Amino acid sequence: MTANLKVLASVFKLRIGVFCALAAIAGALATPGAVPDFAPVMAVALAVLLSAAAAGAFNHYWERDIDPMMNRTRNRPFATGQFAAGPLWPLGLLALTVAAVALAAFAANAWAALHVFLGAFVYGIVYTVWLKRRTAWNIVIGGLSGSFAVLAGAAVAVPTLSPESLILALVLFLWTPPHFWSLATALKDDYAAAGIPMLPVVCSETETNRIILANTIALVASSLLPAFFGAGPLYLGAAILGGGWFLYKSVALVRRPGRKAAMGNFFASLIQLVLLLTAVMVEPLLAG
């Protein structure tokens, strides 16, 4: 039973889905004004989780031909044949996405539903189907899926786009490339074997690491912008601490390149995101 649950959690990429759901909650709480009602925020967060899970499972389904070529993915259920890749899978995942969009529309409004749909569409179709095997900049556009999670949550509080929610969406957009490129650097041989043109595959190590550093600088700078829109000391401290650590590890990656440094940068990106989202969610609650 436990093994089956682990397989399903892997196929539906629930860890990514949980991060997206937290981003949606953060988006709702980052929007100025009174703290929104608990029920619609949680409903939209669930909708984001479900739509992200559907997109993640579709990613597994679509990439079943190349996953066996990569050490990291060769044991995925679709790659091994543990799950039969019949037509019911995409139909079921489409139905799950429709249900998630309907939940957001019912619990909040049409804007929240639109952002839930766009997040799933960008990851499942734009990134997975259209871009991943064609361009090294695939993950740059794919990073919009996290931004739409923020905007879905923000729409619960205020359907129109606020500067605060747009800045947080920008932070998620800028966070994704250096996060994923760091992992791709460590797994460069896997992506090369599968013929996927990730940035570390098509660019030199030096060029890739400099691009990661430049993106991290832009990310850290954008994460400080909420200070000009009323963000409190908790958020500012989290942004400085998490951003400073991520920036330090990105500089280290440029100076001492290698797999160990790349994974260190990857984990630094996770620390930064956790600190930022936690601060965004906690600070409004402490303020009452």
From Swiss-Prot:
Say which family it is in.
Answer: Belongs to the UbiA prenyltransferase family. Protoheme IX farnesyltransferase subfamily.
What's its catalytic activity? heme b + (2E,6E)-farnesyl diphosphate + H2O = Fe(II)-heme o + diphosphate
Q: May I have one GO cellular component term?
A: plasma membrane
Q: What EC number(s) does the entry state?
A: 2.5.1.141
What is the organism of origin for this protein? Paramagnetospirillum magneticum (strain ATCC 700264 / AMB-1) (Magnetospirillum magneticum)
PANTHER family, sorted: PROTOHEME IX FARNESYLTRANSFERASE, MITOCHONDRIAL
| TM spans (from-to) | 16-36, 38-58, 88-108, 111-131, 139-159, 166-186, 227-247, 266-286
Write out the entry's keywords from A to Z. Answer: Cell inner membrane, Cell membrane, Heme biosynthesis, Membrane, Transferase, Transmembrane, Transmembrane helix
Q: What else is known?
A: Carbon 2 of the heme B porphyrin ring is defined according to the Fischer nomenclature.
The protein's name in its UniProt record: Protoheme IX farnesyltransferase 2
* Entry-linked InterPro entries: Protohaem_IX_farnesylTrfase (IPR006369), UbiA_prenyltransferase (IPR000537), UbiA_prenylTrfase_CS (IPR030470), UbiA_sf (IPR044878)
Say if the entry is tagged with keyword Hydrolase: no
HAMAP family per the UniProt record, alphabetical: CyoE_CtaB
- Enzyme class, top EC level, equals transferase
- Give coiled-coil spans as residue ranges: none
Identify its membrane topology class: Multi-pass membrane protein
Record bears the keyword Transmembrane: yes
The subcellular localization recorded is:
Cell inner membrane
Give GO MF terms, alphabetically.
protoheme IX farnesyltransferase activity
Q: Report any one BP term from Gene Ontology.
A: heme O biosynthetic process
